[in-house]
């Protein structure tokens, strides 16, 4: 949560990973919701995306529930690429996107006991 606040106040985000340095397939904590592949059985077992999230943190929550409910892990495959044209409208302090993002982070922290 404090990394999120710091990224807005001071403009730096220590949680971003330089993906150009990742050359191996590996297990990760979570993956972006803009490009996920999930077995239908796993998706249905966890109840899909939590519709109480709006635009932000739904992918973190989904990956956390996959692991906690099924024991499955999220796996990053280096050879698979996708291009996501993200607008990043959540970067302006106190914009509606910022507030949605903040709301989702608070929800995620409370639900996951982060």
Stretch-by-stretch model annotation:
Residues 1-3, 31, 98-102:
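A structural signal for well-ordered alpha-helical scaffolds and beta->alpha junctions
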Residues 1-5, 39, 105:
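Generic structural signal for conserved hydrophobic packing positions in ordered secondary structure
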Residues 5, 9, 14, 52, ...:
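Hydrophobic transmembrane alpha-helix bundles
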Residues 28-29, 91:
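Residues at structural and domain junctions
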Residues 61-114:
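Active-site-adjacent helix/loop segment of glycosyltransferases
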């Amino acid at each position: 949560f404090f990394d999120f606040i710091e990224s807005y106040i001071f403009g730096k985000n220590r949680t971003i990973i330089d993906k150009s340095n990742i050359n191996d397939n590996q297990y990760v904590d979570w993956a972006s919701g803009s490009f996920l592949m999930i077995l239908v059985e796993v998706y249905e077992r966890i109840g899909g995306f939590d519709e109480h999230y709006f635009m932000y943190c739904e992918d973190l929550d989904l990956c956390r529930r996959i692991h906690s409910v099924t024991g499955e892990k999220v796996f990053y495959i280096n050879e698979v690429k996708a291009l996501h044209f993200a607008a990043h409208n959540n970067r302006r302090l106190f914009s509606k996107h910022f507030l949605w993002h903040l709301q989702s982070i608070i929800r995620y922290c409370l639900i996951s006991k982060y």
